Amino acid sequence: CSSDLIRPLSSGIPDTIGAFASCIDADMEGLYEQDPYKHLLVQTLSDRLAEAATEKMHEYVRKEAWGYAKDESLSMPDLLVEKYQGIRPAVGYPSLPDQSINFLLDELLDMKQIGITLTENGAMYPHASVCGLMFAHPAAEYFSVGKIGEDQLEDYARRRGKSTEEMRKFLAA
């Protein structure tokens, strides 16, 4: 559970959680529309560039901003398999499946400043966009929320102040 990766307020020990958003210019989506192969290449490259920007930002946070890994020196293979401390789950992925989190992150980060807009369902535009959270906890590992039971969905919706049906839409549960 993501909340296990942050110290409780009652501990009296400060802790930090990061929020991030990254995207590639929306104009990239219109390139080579008449050539499906080149268009697919541009889309794929755009997705990878958005992820790479996020990876670089996460490295900066680990080494400089939060400084908990100042001496980190990973080889490219180790970097690619994420042999560093901390995780950065992205919204919509198994560790953070609730698409409505995008609206909270948008309120916090004002993502339109970098060109990201949200649909009514919380999907991001341009498609080559990613946002999520950063955790520095030494034991943090990616996990999958898994199948959400009806009782869990009802409890989560109640705690989020939303209807069960609304949360079902955002969780695709």
Listing of model-derived features with the role each one plays in the protein:
Residues P8, E59-R158, T164-E165, K169-A172:
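Compositionally biased, low-complexity/repeat regions
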Residues S10-K70:
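ATP-dependent carboxylate/acyl-activation modules
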Residues Q43, D47, E51, E150, ...:
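Electropositive phosphate-/nucleotide-binding environments in soluble metabolic enzymes
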